[in-house]
Amino acid sequence: GESFGVLELCKILGIRQSALSHHLKILAKAKIVSTRKEGNSIFYRRALLKEDDPYREIKESILEHVDKIPMPDDIKRQIKNIQVERAERSLSFFRKNADKFQIKQGLIVEHTDYASSLHDVIASLNIHDESQIVEVGPGEGELLAELTRKFKNLLALDNSQEMLEKCKNTISSGKCEGVKFMLGDTSIALAKNIKSDLLILNMVLHHIPTPAKTFRDASSLLNRGGHLLIVDLGRHDQDWVRDSCGDIWLGFEEADLNDWGSKVNLEVGQSSYLSLRNGFQIQMRVFTKTINPK
């Protein structure tokens, strides 16, 4: 599931912080919720139950029953408001920094640092040249331009008009063919009945306010046997990337990505890792939509 900060949970539940903190402390002690530090903020999410947890079956039963309880409309509304606030902060960053984004991103990693490894991963998937390839948040379009040499049907999906224009300019100046452009996110793509054989999120997931939902959307967008390719940072504690690069999340644990995938019929495939000189680690993760969903 998604992660929420304490103040966000207070808004969602309409409860005072002191009272909520008391309940969260009990849930954390019972290992029903887990915490992750994002800079100066602590986020809470449903814990990943471990195989050796002696109370695993009891906890699973509790959570299954909780999932069956209808969520009140006012809570759904508050969650949506939180998601909109996060998304707006991210969009605001890209509106203000579209002209400088590549420079800012370069503070963490340059595309050339891992492009060769990324193309090796894509080549290993044996995807037909006429397959539908979708890149979510293509930035200035470097990867898409490279992919036009191998594939004929590509779609650039971005919810930032400014960044989508940057991508269009790159594709146009490179005289690349076979690329279409769509303003919006994965929800918009679903509404327009887009289907994909390869869905790529290249250094994008840490900008998305609801990563677990993105996995759900990805599963719906993929054809059976299609692949979701996540290229992102491993978990880190470099809080400066929030202001400098517009990051919402400080990378991701491998277990989190695996959990989000397993819940939406996306099987874990190959994984590649690349350590950078500045201390960051790039993870390239492939998830395949199962032929026979659970």
Language-model segment annotations:
Residues 132-134, 138-188:
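Class I SAM-dependent methyltransferase SAM/SAH-binding core
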Residues 187-199:
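A short acidic, Gly/Pro-enriched loop at the edge of an enzyme's catalytic core
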Residues 197-210:
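A short SAM/SAH-binding and catalytic strip from SAM-dependent methyltransferases
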Residues 227-285:
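C-terminal alpha-helical "lid/dimerization" subdomain adjacent to the S-adenosyl-L-methionine
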